[in-house]
Amino acid sequence: MTLAASGSPRSALGIVLRTVTHGAAYARHLVRGNHVRSDLTWSRPGTPPVLLAHGFLGTRGTMMPLAKRFADDGRATFTYHHGTFQLRSLRASAQELVEHIDRLQQTLGVEQFDVVGFSMGGLVALHAVKFLQAHRAIRRLALLGAPTDGTWAGLVGVATVGLVSPSVWQCLPSSDFIADLRAGTLPPGLRVRQIHGLHDALCPLPRPLTGVDPQRDFIVLPGGHSSLVMSHPFYRELKSFFDAPDDAEQPVAAAE
């Protein structure tokens, strides 16, 4: 499903203003850092907990708007901190995600989670399900503005922290990591939804992944990169994805 933006000047100006507002709100949550509490309120028994993975140069604080919305809807939520500003290897972060889920399974006594991977956090989660068998503990995976074709915006990171950060090299479109990630197959039975902002300058619109239904689970809405976690229409797509009954699952044809 793709929703194109209106071409009128007034509509375009409104989109720009909302995107700037979302960026400012995102920055306020960024400075909250990683010392934030997960919400263990669980008023909808039987629903999987939601695990949120932040993006490059992000913190757990950036996931708090989504965490609050899920908590308000009765879901137990956990924000996942994968390294200082996500500078290290994405493969190492994916391994840590698997270990984090294992610990939560033992602590909470639950078998499966719904996972939201924002931006680079989506690449981490996708690698975990494709190569580290994380799908055994993940019921559904939402990739929120994840650059699954890579992004040349990573060159900014290469120029600034490239000497100490493997991850900025791995997110480039020409990287072996991106090539392997696209070539790997999604595990059978795992439903994945890709959600993108039409005006996202950091993550240009990628191709649908093989195994993702391009009509049902490839969603494009007006907004920029920060809008993905700040704007309610994007949250509605996450909620509908996680709330859909399991018997709605259907075989998906290859998208590539």
Q: Residue locations for each model-derived region?
A:
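Serine-dependent carboxylesterase/thioesterase catalytic core
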Residues: 50-56, 61, 73-186, 206
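Short, proline-enriched alpha-helix->beta-strand connector loops that line the catalytic pocket
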Residues: 47-48, 186-192, 213-216
